[in-house]
Amino acid sequence: VKRLSGLRLQVENPEQLARFYADVLGMDAWAEDEAWRAGYAGEDADLILLPGGRRVQHSRDERYWKIGICLPDLDAACEQLRRKGVDVSAPHQFRDIGYMAHLHDPEGFAIELLQHDFLGRRPDDAGDPMLPLGGGAHLGQITLRTGDIAAELAARADMALLSVQDVAEFGFDLHFLAYTREAPPVPDLRAVGNREWLWRRPYTTLEFQHLAGAKLRDSPAFLGLELT
């Protein structure tokens, strides 16, 4: 089975940004030729930070959106980040999708923090507040936007579609794909019952925010995905 092993971003200062992901978000960081890699141990994807980029305002009409970091205890993670002076939004349960919070890295790239369990369902023994981000964090999603989900799915026929999540009042739906032989516990891919299962997967999923018919522009910083 192939693996989604990296997200390639062209940034202003690869080493400095990698240090943020290491010091603040608990990833390992190391130099690799002219780039820096930052990632968690395990089968999830790394960030591959390449030189030559410049800091620009990111907007909602761009192809690239965010990364999502899944973890067992969102409240502990946010408390830790605030103690380090990081501006992170208040955790909230977004519809029947997940308990989440948002922040930006020093170059303005969006990061979502997503708890394994919905609000009020976290086990008492989840995570460890002494570990970075409360322990157990992994890169759960790389999120792109699309105006044509049928074309995206056709281009990625070797990936399994694991979940489809409607967010009709905001005018989009979400599709999650992965290189895996696993099947969700509930055969209906729209079932809410699959979502907490999805946030626990050890591999990184490719998430599409589908805005039907949207005309999106390329993101200068997004240099594609690494597959191994």
Can you say where each PLM-predicted feature lies in the sequence?
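Short amphipathic alpha-helical segments
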Residues: 3-7, 45, 61-67, 138-142, ...
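Histidine-centered metal-chelating micro-motifs
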Residues: 54-55, 100
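Short glycine-biased active-site loop of nucleotidyltransferases that positions the nucleotide triphosphate
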Residues: 39-42, 59, 102
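Residue-level marker of regulatory loop/turn positions in helix-turn-helix DNA-binding domains and
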Residues: 59-60, 131
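Core segments of cupin and vicinal oxygen chelate
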Residues: 1-48, 52, 144-203
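Short proline/glycine-enriched turn/loop motifs at strand-loop junctions of beta-rich domains
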Residues: 71-75
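Vicinal oxygen chelate
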Residues: 6, 78-144, 155-157, 162-194, ...
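Short amphipathic beta-strand starts and helix->beta connectors
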Residues: 49-54, 126-127, 204-212
